[in-house]
From Swiss-Prot:
One of its GO terms (biological process) is hydrogen peroxide catabolic process. Keywords: Heme, Iron, Metal-binding, Oxygen transport, Transport. The gene is hbb3. Heme b binds at residues 63, 92. GO terms for cellular component: blood microparticle; haptoglobin-hemoglobin complex; hemoglobin complex. This is Hemoglobin subunit beta-3.
Length: 147
């Protein structure tokens, strides 16, 4: 992926403002509620059978924070996101058998939570465009090892 200076600045500036322990749980909860078929990958999380259970589940929140923390790898490797996620992609493909479309769904949830947090004055159309490109690069990298 090639980044313009404006895109790189928008992504890095936004990333510095993101609280992973707020956005991550928000996005993970939204994913499990809006796309309930994704719940099958989280059977070890205990009760996630209702929206209220998902909202109150500490393991859901913790995993959301972990996922958002994992985006830091892409931030630090913006010029080689595919390389940075090679092993994680392989794990999700070969061991966890995650449908790669779920990465896109989670990216949408992350974007919604970020937009809701920062609003249109900070999450402008230009910032949204750069953020979308960034998450598209991450989802592509995570999907790369699938056969």
């Amino acid at each position: 992926v090639e980044w313009t200076d404006a895109e790189r600045t928008a992504i890095l500036t936004l990333w510095k403002k993101i609280n992973i322990d707020e956005i991550g749980p928000c996005a993970m909860r939204r994913l499990l509620i809006v796309s309930p078929w994704t719940q099958r990958h989280f059977s070890t999380f205990g009760n996630i059978s209702t929206n209220a259970a998902i909202m109150d589940n500490d393991l859901v929140a913790k995993h959301g924070s972990t996922v958002m923390g994992g985006l830091d790898r892409a931030i630090k490797n913006m010029d080689d996101i595919k390389g940075a996620y090679r092993e994680l992609s392989k794990k999700h493909s070969d061991q966890l058998h995650v449908d790669p479309d779920n990465f896109r769904l989670l990216a949408e949830c992350i974007t919604l939570c970020v937009a809701g947090k920062f609003g249109p004055k900070e999450f402008t159309a230009d910032v949204h465009e750069a953020w979308y490109k960034f998450l598209a690069a991450v989802t592509s990298a995570l999907s790369r090892q699938y056969h």
